[in-house]
Amino acid sequence: MKAEIISVGTEILLGDIVNTNSQFLAKELASLGIEVYHQSTVGDNKQRLLECFDESLKRSDFVITTGGLGPTGDDMTKETAAEYFGQKLELHKPSLEVLESFFVKTGKKMAENNMKQVYFPKDAIVLKNNNGTAPGAILKKDGKFIIVLPGPPREMKAMFNESVKPYLQQFTNEMLVSKTLRLYGIGESNLELEILDIINEQTNPTVALYAKELEVTIRITAKAENEREAFKLIKPVEEKIKSRVGKYVYTEGDISISEGETALEDAVSKLLVEKNLTIAVAESCTGGLVSSSLINYPGISSVFLEGCVTYSNDSKMKRLGVKRETLEEFGAVSEQTAIEMAEGVAKGLKANIGISTTGVAGPGGGTKEKPVGLVYTAIYINGKTIVKKNIFNGDRRKIRLRATRDLLNELRIQLEKL
């Protein structure tokens, strides 16, 4: 079965808001074994939406729309879908009762234009909205159908899960199941070279790579009658991949991550909590980014003792006990200073682990010997200190971000050895 997703709204078309609805729907439809080959975004324009319906239903069995179900004049998705199928709208009394009850409970007066939200084609399946005023609907004709859902993600997701998903399950006898591996420390090109034969030889399951900022995701997807059978197909492929690049895998599972974000910090924080190892952080060039990454994880307060930003030499000496001679001989950006920072913050707080960053984030301040992008990171753990030197490319933001993630990944590796 084939479906298409149409996002309706000029605000999406202009980039004023991020369209997360399509991502959610694509994943949900895939899990039902429904194929999605096209997604479209249309502004608040009836003629263009009619054209989009026509093109989509030539290629697919049904269309799901989000947005355009509000009370204003430019909310026209339902009306346009009805026009496309040649169906007239009429008052849906159960929806009117729900709408009137909503306004009574909230103590607000219902505007006249809210009435347009309770008109539907006679044979439409009306979908109750438990989180807003705009019901959805399923409009059908000649074996094709259009599902119209509200635009606000909270309303759309609830309506899909409560009403649409059960409706669609009658049309599917297979399901798609995916297993996700998230990797750090290897680029997409090198990863592809490592597992290219696995990618090429697979039909079910399939293997796909997705590059994000500073990390790569491997998605293994199988089609089967049920989840158990799908995972049976996935397991040998997953094991084969891990035998080659397993050292780069920092977490697995279908975790939804926004562009530019990562689950790496959660993986590290989880290890710290599970192993009950306390940690203290001393930062210079990253300016608190390491600490803020770790404390996003629920329960981290049981092991995270302190994070300090020691930007100046004076603060490095006073707060961390970095020797004046070290700073004078080697400089603030040096292996020796990074080591003393990590050891100083750990010993001062009696933490099991101390980590540190010091570097030149730019755009100025670099020299031939110490260029912009030079960063030293150190980890004090089990009485030993591991120090790394990196020269990162990019602007100030990216250098700080890469330094943070590289340090967290190295910490993950050390924790997994314990």
Curated annotation (Swiss-Prot):
* Matches recorded under SMART domains: MoCF_biosynth
List where this protein forms a coiled coil: none
Q: Where are the transmembrane segments?
A: none
Known InterPro entries for this protein?
CinA, CinA-like_C, CinA_C, CinA_KH, Competence-induced_CinA, MoaB/Mog-like_dom_sf, MoaB/Mog_dom
User: Span of the secretion signal?
Assistant: none
Q: So what family is this one in?
A: Belongs to the CinA family.
Q: Which PANTHER family match?
A: NICOTINAMIDE-NUCLEOTIDE AMIDOHYDROLASE PNCC, NMN AMIDOHYDROLASE-LIKE PROTEIN YFAY
**Protein name in the entry:** Putative competence-damage inducible protein
Classification of source organism: Bacteria, Bacillati, Bacillota, Clostridia, Peptostreptococcales
